[in-house]
Amino acid sequence: VTASEEFITNTLGNEGYAFAEVSGVPEILEDEQAVNLTFFVEPGQRTYVRRIEFIGNERTYDVVLRREMRQMEGAWASNALIENSKLRLERLGFFKQVEVETKPVPGISDQVDIEYTVEEEFSGSIGGSIGYGAWGLTLGANYSENNAFGTGNRLVVGINKNAWQTSY
């Protein structure tokens, strides 16, 4: 019963009915050894997204996060699109954790705000190398950053030096 209620609620949520209420009432028929299930569905009003907000992105620009959104502001709220947007943020690799919360707008019954809370993590790496060969001692260093300057672009810088050449 609970799984069926959740399925109906999620299906309605994908169609913009974010606050749908579904309750299943079983009726046991002992003579027939069966159970009748009656579902009472109150979809409520279709709900639209007023605003999408990001919290915790101190380094990454909002535009980088917004381009991953599949749920759009002004469109009706879809549970599937909200979760898909969360998954896309997680796959960027810039965050330790991504949480999403859908909040009703006070005083407006058919609108919600969606709040994504992210916890940024270091997305770069530093490396070095040392070697010896026909040209003598070779030294190398490199730095790579997957979210350069918060733009979501990748930056790689490296240098190798020995007695005969220097390469960047």
Positions of the model-derived regions?
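Periplasmic polypeptide-binding modules associated with outer-membrane biogenesis and secretion
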Residues: V1-L137, N142, V156-S167
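Short loop/turn motifs that connect adjacent beta-strands in outer-membrane beta-barrel proteins
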Residues: A148-R154
